[in-house]
């Protein structure tokens, strides 16, 4: 499709030349994603995970992944790993057992977040062993990641890792794990995964991880419960301990950020400052959220607006989509903690009765999908510095608790 002539591409974008558009059919791309492709020396790997396999993914997430492959072209190998023994992309075909917790090796993980934490346990080893990009399947790429990869691959640059940051506490940002790009064999990735493995131990679920001595120094969360995890009255609907349990992998990196390893002198703060290319999540991943009061219902309303809708409905939808096409890197639609969001577009699109509304012909959802492939942003991504907490670094061994500050 091409959008109606009355829709003008936004300032800050330029048309992608037809010669640069991927000519493959969706079916051809799906076959390439579903096949087992052994890693090579190339680090241009796009990694994702869906516990029950490609065929069982919600259709809108399949379209997301096909779209990644089309945007990146054949230079990148896109894989969606799964938890099905014997499948072409079973995670153990790529991640050796010693890098997985016993609960995963023995298939005894339990609780509502088995799929989420299974993905957590493969994302870091995949980047460490093979390099490339990790992205959750609930994300629509708005612009190519190639320019970020070019920075990481440039021998004149010090960067080896890229990710988003989010302000979890006043004056303190965390590096989050939805989108990450890393060079093979990066030390930070190894230490991060080792810390998460140690934290998890032989547990079968995340319950109680907030009590672990390695995380006992963390200050209470604040802004994480603003907007994304609040009700319609902006009141928190999830307790801090449950949030830390769920997102424990992220908080393991908070620990490494403040660690100087007494065994070998490795300095987490220095490593992050020198080797990580960081972008603000509220600018480059959740840019759409405050624009819609964090309401999935409002996002759904805008994207299902038809081109011939009356004003101001039509104008609002066009303005919203054009803003996304020009000003953000991707749009990640979250499920997150169970019952922790008053309205989630991911939940709406998961509902079979809304199948196809993420790309319905004649709607601004269709225009969003079209624009991400046919328009190219002209802005340059500029890295931000991680906002670390005030106070000294902790000189301890890798798995030694930080001294109490009480």
From Swiss-Prot:
Keyword check for Transferase: yes
InterPro entries, per database record: AfumC-like_glycosyl_Trfase, Nucleotide-diphossugar_trans
Record-level Gene Ontology MF annotations: glycosyltransferase activity
Stored Gene3D superfamilies: 3.90.550.20
Positions of the UniProt region annotated as Disordered: 1-26
Temperature dependence: Optimum temperature is 35 degrees Celsius.
Pathway the protein acts in: Mycotoxin biosynthesis
UniProt note: pH dependence: Optimum pH is 5.5.
One Pfam family per UniProt: Caps_synth
Keyword field: Glycosyltransferase, Transferase
The protein's role, per its UniProt record: O-glycosyltransferase; part of the 2 gene clusters that mediate the biosynthesis of fusicoccins, diterpene glucosides that display phytohormone-like activity and function as potent activators of plasma membrane H(+)-ATPases in plants by modifying 14-3-3 proteins and cause the plant disease constriction canker.
Sequence similarity: Belongs to the afumC glycosyltransferase family.
Protein name: O-glycosyltransferase PaGT
Organism: Phomopsis amygdali (Fusicoccum amygdali)
